[in-house]
């Protein structure tokens, strides 16, 4: 940018169409967050009515993560082929329909299936909305675009908590899910009133349709084998999370089978750049493992361990959700200032100072607990607002929606595992200790993976001929693309 351009406030670099695109996608994220967290708010009520164990109840949260990998792949491919806008609308319709079905669910299995539908819609919303906004904004503002957008999910969670305190005590838990159908009205408006993403239009204007991940996996020479593997992965995940398997060895074998299938899909769809894709899945997996025990089971902890009433639970969750929303926006500014990876690492390190006090303080002082949660979530959860930008930078425009959607949502299986891990550990420790210890230990893994830029580093080790040296979104160099001690100026010469 020129000096004159740099002196202009960042928000003046955006025109009305770009702000409208952002506003529409942000509202979609808000509604997504609202629908998704409803189950966490009423988990104890559902558990009591259906007579579920704590692990079974936690699996209802996990269900939405089980289907996300497939939703991310299919709806992401739709976004790559037909445009980001259509994928956004389809995603909203899916998660709204699944939420309504939860309200009518007569038992555990029906609700589990409805949560699978929600997961598919949520995955599509994540991949399509993130790529839509990132590709609509100027390159130098795309950390902000990512962070500001993801804040909508946390705001939706805050709104859901407030609605919970007003609706459930009077009309019961099912009424909360009936409200979740409202986003379909928004989807109809969205279809008519927002423009297509600029990057996508430039790439596809007047050209033949791209070959998407769906084309590669399900219309190529290995389509029969891939369909069989897809069914095998879905069946294995079902038995792992809904089949009530007691044998840990069988669960481990099924988990390894799923991992092998997902790696196979990544190798087929990304070719020589598969090490980058696999490592991105690992990054996201651990990002969910550190964050989602708290996200999923915090309402249960507040209601059971601290014995808070619904109104107090809503107040505490307001601090938590609002902190995450603020953190997403702060993360956008940090990403522009420090760079995406450095901002991520610094924010997570700061959050580690607060995670133990959050669960050590107890419930005597609600306001102190709320403030601790606000800052911990701002630093620990909010920084994930720039994760779409971080992941998207490893993919070209042609495969960005599907690549981001599939990679992120396979890794998001950590979110399926996280609440169950928390519930299992809570059988031996109290729930607060379980949540705090999981989050504290696994955050360090994410710090190392992102701080060392392991996707680029492993790519350089295994398939250096396909190494991407610069971020595909903002053009900045990847630190892991060069060995330690090499001149970073070399990256400028090898920019791809």
Swiss-Prot record:
Catalyzed chemical reaction(s): N-acetylneuraminate(in) + H(+)(in) = N-acetylneuraminate(out) + H(+)(out)
Keywords, alphabetical: Cell inner membrane, Cell membrane, Membrane, Sugar transport, Transmembrane, Transmembrane helix, Transport
UniProt membrane topology term: Multi-pass membrane protein
A molecular function GO annotation: sialic acid:proton symporter activity
Predominant subcellular localization, coarse grouping: membrane
Pfam families (UniProt xref): MFS_1
CDD domains listed in its UniProt record: MFS_SV2_like
Family under the similarity heading: Belongs to the major facilitator superfamily. Sialate:H(+) symporter (SHS) (TC 2.A.1.12) family.
Functional description taken from the UniProt entry: Catalyzes the proton-dependent transport of sialic acid.
Annotated protein name in UniProt: Sialic acid transporter NanT 1
Species of origin: Escherichia coli O6:H1 (strain CFT073 / ATCC 700928 / UPEC)
Gene that specifies this protein: nanT1
């Amino acid at each position: 940018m020129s000096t004159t351009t740099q002196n202009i406030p960042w928000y003046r670099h955006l025109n009305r169409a770009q702000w409208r695109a952002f506003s529409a996608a942000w509202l979609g994220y808000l509604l997504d967050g609202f629908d998704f967290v409803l189950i966490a708010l009423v988990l104890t009520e559902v558990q009591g009515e259906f007579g579920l164990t704590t692990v079974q109840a936690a699996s209802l949260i996990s269900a939405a993560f089980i289907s996300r990998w497939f939703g991310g792949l299919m709806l992401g491919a739709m976004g790559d082929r037909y445009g980001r806008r259509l994928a956004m609308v389809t995603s909203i319709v899916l998660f709204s329909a699944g939420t309504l079905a939860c309200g009518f669910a007569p038992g555990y299995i029906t609700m589990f299936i409805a949560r699978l539908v929600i997961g598919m819609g949520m995955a599509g919303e994540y991949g399509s909305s993130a790529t839509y906004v990132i590709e609509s904004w100027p390159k130098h503002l795309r950390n902000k675009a990512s962070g500001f957008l993801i804040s909508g999910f946390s705001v939706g969670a805050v709104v859901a908590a407030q609605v919970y305190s007003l609706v459930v005590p009077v009309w019961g838990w099912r009424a909360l899910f009936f409200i979740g159908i409202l986003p379909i009205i928004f989807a109809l408006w969205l279809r008519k009133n927002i423009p297509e993403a600029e990057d996508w239009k430039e790439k596809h204007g007047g050209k033949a349709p791209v070959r998407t991940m769906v084309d590669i996996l399900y219309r190529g020479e290995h389509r029969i084998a891939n369909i069989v593997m897809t069914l095998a992965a879905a069946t294995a995940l079902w038995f792992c999370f809904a089949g009530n398997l007691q044998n840990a060895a069988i669960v481990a074998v099924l988990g390894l089978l799923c991992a092998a299938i997902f790696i196979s899909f990544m190798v087929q769809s990304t070719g020589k750049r598969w090490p980058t894709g696999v490592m991105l899945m690992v990054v996201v997996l651990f990002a969910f493992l550190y964050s989602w025990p708290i996200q999923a089971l915090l309402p249960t902890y507040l209601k059971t361990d601290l014995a808070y009433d619904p109104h107090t639970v809503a107040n505490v969750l307001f601090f938590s959700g609002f902190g995450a929303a603020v953190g997403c926006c702060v993360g956008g500014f940090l990403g522009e200032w420090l760079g995406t990876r450095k901002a991520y690492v610094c924010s997570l390190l700061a959050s580690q100072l607060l995670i133990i006090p959050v669960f050590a303080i107890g419930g005597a002082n609600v306001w102190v607990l709320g403030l601790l949660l606000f800052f911990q979530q701002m630093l620990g959860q909010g920084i994930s607002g720039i994760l779409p930008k971080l992941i998207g930078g490893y993919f070209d425009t042609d495969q960005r929606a599907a690549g981001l959607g599939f990679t992120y949502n396979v890794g998001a299986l950590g979110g399926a595992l996280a609440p169950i891990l928390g519930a299992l550990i809570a059988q031996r420790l109290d729930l607060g200790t379980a949540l705090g210890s999981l989050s504290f230990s696994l955050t360090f893994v994410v710090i190392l993976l992102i701080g060392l830029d392991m996707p680029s580093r492993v790519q350089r080790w295994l398939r250096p001929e396909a190494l991407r040296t610069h971020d595909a979104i903002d053009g900045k160099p990847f630190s892991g693309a060069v060995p330690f001690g090499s001149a970073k100026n070399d990256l400028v010469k090898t920019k791809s």
